[in-house]
Amino acid sequence: MAVKVLVVDDSGFFRRRVSEILSADPTIQVVGTATNGKEAIDQALALKPDVITMDYEMPMMDGITAVRHIMQRCPTPVLMFSSLTHEGARVTLDALDAGAVDYLPKNFEDISRNPDKVKQLLCEKVHTISRSNRRIGSYARTAPVAAPAPASTFTSQAQTRPAAPARAAAPTPAASQSPAPKRKPYKLVAIGTSTGGPVALQRVLTQLPANFPAPIVLIQHMPAAFTKAFAERLDKLCRISVKEAEDGDMLRPGLALLAPGGKQMMIDGRGTVKILPGDERLNYKPCVDITFGSAAKSYGDKVLSVVLTGMGADGREGARLLKQGGSTVWAQDEASCVIYGMPMAIVKANLADAVYSLDEIGKHLVEACV
């Protein structure tokens, strides 16, 4: 059965080109279009699409407000189009926080030329998020939706570090069957993720105390223009410190370093971060396998690694190296994943020492390390 898609954009050109690209795939059916957020809500309720592609800047109602309403009234996987700018990154992160599953850069030049790479990427994203966890609405903010704001309104983040997680609590998935972890003198916590990762990392890291005793490295598949904004966002929400990693940074307790987009991050035995150019032969920049592999070489059995929601199998080979060195590997459970791909690869390869729900992982990190 074809994946039913609703295309939402105030640009007639972009709406038409996205519809043409998707309709050229016989396994995808464009069932409707909308020009603003209000129309998107009405069409989502009427057409019940499998996936919605959504612009942000639109008249009547912006895309983020529309996503919040859709997640409350008819939870549907949403693919956001975003600009590759710092401000575009902040807006995209707001959309993911509201419940969108994934995003794509909005590039008029690329889409007008209609290169094969754009067509392939768009169709792959649509197919992937159509299979995402239909409980996705439970991972959006649970606060009541406010009256629609003008499209130009942007809610700024609070400037003070909160004493507790800033997100409203979402419904908690059933507890996993893995036992609580045993305490061990870990020298490093390494967390890798992809689709669904921005919200998942926020949920995990906001549970950690400011005096968390182990250094943390984060590998999130994300463009270069987005990682700095994402690190800044996490730093404002968490009690630990979070920053985008730079070459020469030193690991230290209570600090999480986020791998920069478009590059690779490695760690040496002295706790020094090495940032390397992204290898074009690798599918992911940053790549979880690269960072996990360097951690295995430098820290032996003293690494606690966690693989969260995401498509594909990045992290599996790095986790294999960590296991061979005696380190610990956790995977997020299927029920709480947006996309059960990367964690599934860990589980199927028999590399997982424990499988926990998203809401358990932060608590268990504290139990294992503090």
Swiss-Prot record:
Residues 4-121 form the Response regulatory domain. Keywords: Chemotaxis, Cytoplasm, Hydrolase, Phosphoprotein. The modification 4-aspartylphosphate is found at residue 55. GO terms for biological process: chemotaxis. The keyword Transferase does not apply. It is found in: Cytoplasm. The active site is at 194, 221, 314. Contains a C-terminal catalytic domain, and an N-terminal region which modulates catalytic activity. Belongs to the CheB family. The keyword Magnesium does not apply. It is an enzyme of class 3 (hydrolase). HAMAP family: CheB_chemtxs. Its EC number is 3.1.1.61, 3.5.1.44. It comes from the Bacteria. Phosphorylated by CheA. Phosphorylation of the N-terminal regulatory domain activates the methylesterase activity. GO terms for molecular function: phosphorelay response regulator activity; protein-glutamate methylesterase activity; protein-glutamine glutaminase activity. The gene is cheB1. Its main location: cytoplasm. One of its GO terms (cellular component) is cytoplasm. It catalyses: [protein]-L-glutamate 5-O-methyl ester + H2O = L-glutamyl-[protein] + methanol + H(+); L-glutaminyl-[protein] + H2O = L-glutamyl-[protein] + NH4(+). Involved in chemotaxis. Part of a chemotaxis signal transduction system that modulates chemotaxis in response to various stimuli. Catalyzes the demethylation of specific methylglutamate residues introduced into the chemoreceptors (methyl-accepting chemotaxis proteins or MCP) by CheR. Also mediates the irreversible deamidation of specific glutamine residues to glutamic acid. PANTHER family: PROTEIN-GLUTAMATE METHYLESTERASE/PROTEIN-GLUTAMINE GLUTAMINASE (PTHR42872), PROTEIN-GLUTAMATE METHYLESTERASE_PROTEIN-GLUTAMINE GLUTAMINASE 1 (PTHR42872:SF3). Residues 150-183 are annotated as: Disordered. This is Protein-glutamate methylesterase/protein-glutamine glutaminase of group 1 operon. P.putida strain KT2440 does not have a chemotaxis group 2 operon.
